[in-house]
Regions:
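Gram-negative outer-membrane beta-barrel transporters
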Residues: 1-91
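Intrinsic-disorder/low-complexity loop/linker signature
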Residues: 18, 45, 100-101, 132
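Hydrophobic, well-ordered secondary-structure elements that form the walls
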Residues: 12, 26, 65, 77, ...
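Short, local alpha-helical segments
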Residues: 98-108, 117-124
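Outer-membrane beta-barrel proteins
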Residues: 2, 14, 49-53, 65, ...
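Residues that define the transmembrane beta-barrel architecture of outer-membrane proteins
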Residues: 6-8, 57-61, 115-119, 133, ...
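C-terminal beta-signal and adjacent terminal beta-strands/loops
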Residues: 80-99, 125-180
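Extracytoplasmic loops and strand-loop junctions of Gram-negative outer membrane beta-barrel proteins
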Residues: 8, 43-49, 101-109, 156-160
Length: 180
């Protein structure tokens, strides 16, 4: 834990809509989160301290746009932006066997991550089967740009806490819904 912290910033959220036809909701946060003094986060005394609070990006935001261009068809676009941040990456404390198929870091390090933009699209079409039953088909793509952490640890000696950014790679989905 740090000896004290300064956290400040600004958050902006907004929504605009035109009936059922279209709506846009957006939010953005710009913040600064720093310890007042160097904080030593590793048990390894040779690892430098930091004033940056781990896992707290200075910038992040989101948007959701939905539209229904016709009575039976609607779609949504959404996205989440996560700015760069500092994330601790701990080296294994156990001795790594020489025949291990994986490479591991040898010293704890504070990693300055890349930023990520997770973009999604979903399409829906509703068929009216009769006055009491409707069938909706939907499909889309989550994380279209495949924004994903590329340096995940692997194997038995991995740092299981070392992850950041979107947790799901590009994913295609389809669905069906029956309702009244």
């Amino acid at each position: 834990n740090g000896s004290g912290a300064e956290v400040y910033g600004i958050n902006i959220d907004g929504k605009i809509a035109h009936g059922r036809d279209a709506s846009l909701q957006v939010g953005f946060t710009a913040q600064r989160s720093r310890y007042k003094e160097l904080t030593y986060w590793s048990e390894d005394s040779s690892v430098e301290g930091t004033r940056n609070m781990p896992r707290t990006p200075d910038y992040y935001g989101y948007f959701t746009f939905t539209a229904a261009p016709s009575k039976n068809f609607d779609f949504s676009l959404s996205g989440v932006y996560t700015g760069r941040m500092h994330v601790p990456h701990f080296a294994p404390t156990d001795e790594i066997p020489s025949d291990s198929p994986y490479q591991y870091i040898v010293k704890d390090e504070m990693v300055h991550t890349p930023d990520f933009f997770d973009f999604n699209v979903k399409l829906n079409y509703t068929f009216v089967l009769n006055e009491h039953v409707k069938l909706q088909l939907n499909g889309g793509v989550q994380n279209i740009f495949n924004a994903f952490q590329e340096d995940l640890d692997r194997g038995v000696f991995r740092d299981s806490g070392y992850f950041y950014g979107p947790t799901q790679p590009r994913t295609y989905f389809i669905g069906i819904k029956l309702f009244n």
